[in-house]
Amino acid sequence: MGINIVDTTLRDGEQKAGIALSVQDKVEIAKIISEMGVHQIEAGIPAMGGDEKISVSKIAALGLPSKIAAWNRMSTKDIDTSIECGVDIVHISSPVSDLQIKTKLEKDRKWVAENLKRTVIYALEKDCEVTVGLEDSSRADLNFLIQLCEMIFALGVKRVRYADTVGIMEPKELYSQIKKIRDKVPIDIEIHVHNDFGMAISNSFAAFKAGAKFADCTITGMGERAGNCDFLKFVKVIQELTGEKIYTGDFEDIIEKENEIKKILRLNW
């Protein structure tokens, strides 16, 4: 398969204003999303505790065809909490732009590299499948991104998430950056974009054409601020422009499944 969908409705999507999901809501949504042919479901952030940890644990226990991932900071405590939930994938995320490293972490590039290495090694030694998220990649120094990719690939990480966290990318530039990373490091790229300029689908497709093998999507494109890449529309774009069918059933079926999720989300569009 050329592109694999990572659905992040239950993590990034839930950050949409006005959305508040119960544990049962999340479990039901995960079941339906898995039926839609996605490779992976980002189920949440166990380190938040409470219902969040409960819902991730319940989803992981379902034994769905989709892999279940949990989002973590560069924290061994976060990682241990995710492992307790029984997820398939531990995703470790860090800001990588100088702006966010300084303002969000109050650290420097050296600290980020050292702590990313430390937590990745920790998770790998716990026999976890690990993916790494590079937050604010689109405002980061490309050479620094490549250095981090080389480091984590050498450690044994097979996939990295390039995140256009603030939604500033356009397709031509994103294609160029993904291509440069792929030319330097044989690591799988997962693209995570936001729709602030209305180009989430176009950017995800451009990243795919540049060699990205994973694309993050949400149901209806819901998410923080202007949202994320719309799952249904992106699947249709891939199908029509490349001939690849992410969902092997009738397309009307996937529309019905989206409508089921929209009812749970209490969305009227």
From Swiss-Prot:
InterPro entries with a match to the protein in the record: AIPM/Hcit_synth_CS, Aldolase_TIM, PYR_CT
Example GO BP: biosynthetic process
Broad enzyme group: transferase
GO terms for MF: homocitrate synthase activity
Record keywords, A-Z: Nitrogen fixation, Transferase
Gene3D superfamilies linked to this entry: Aldolase class I
Domain of life: Bacteria
Protein's UniProt keywords contain Transferase: yes
Enzyme Commission code: 2.3.3.14
Pfam families membership: HMGL-like
Keyword field contains Glycoprotein: no
Catalytic activity: acetyl-CoA + 2-oxoglutarate + H2O = (2R)-homocitrate + CoA + H(+)
Location of the Pyruvate carboxyltransferase domain: 3-255
Other comment: In Clostridium pasteurianum the N-terminal and C-terminal portions of NifV are encoded by two different genes, nifV-alpha and nifV-omega.
Function, as annotated: This protein is a Fe-Mo-cofactor biosynthetic component.
Record family assignment: Belongs to the alpha-IPM synthase/homocitrate synthase family.
Quaternary organization: Heterodimer of an alpha and an omega chain.
UniProt-recorded name of the protein: Homocitrate synthase subunit alpha
Species of provenance: Clostridium pasteurianum
Gene giving rise to this polypeptide: nifV-ALPHA
